Amino acid sequence: MDKHYIYIVKCKDGSLYTGYAKDIEKRIIKHNNGQGAKYTKIRRPVQLVYQEMFDTKSEALKREYEIKTFSRQKKLKLISEG
């Protein structure tokens, strides 16, 4: 069964980016090679600071959407509670 992930990366400028991936390692490499999201392209390098795993893409995308609505402080709390 495939696994699905949501992740948060910390960008060079200190901002946080939340995304979805089936393979986090490959996705982080893409972000750092400028092949990821437009947002991270100009904020490289990025560093993985948080991840969650799900059994279905639907669950992962729902959680990604939820986290994207969080304030920066709420995201930092989530990261620190790991």
UniProtKB/Swiss-Prot annotation:
Q: Which residues cross the membrane?
A: none
- Which Pfam families does the record cross-reference, listed alphabetically? GIY-YIG (PF01541)
Q: What is this protein called?
A: UPF0213 protein SSP2268
Q: Where is the GIY-YIG domain?
A: 2-77
SMART domains linked: GIYc
Spell out the family assignment given in the record's similarity comment.
Answer: Belongs to the UPF0213 family.
The UniProt entry, under SUPFAM superfamilies, shows: GIY-YIG endonuclease
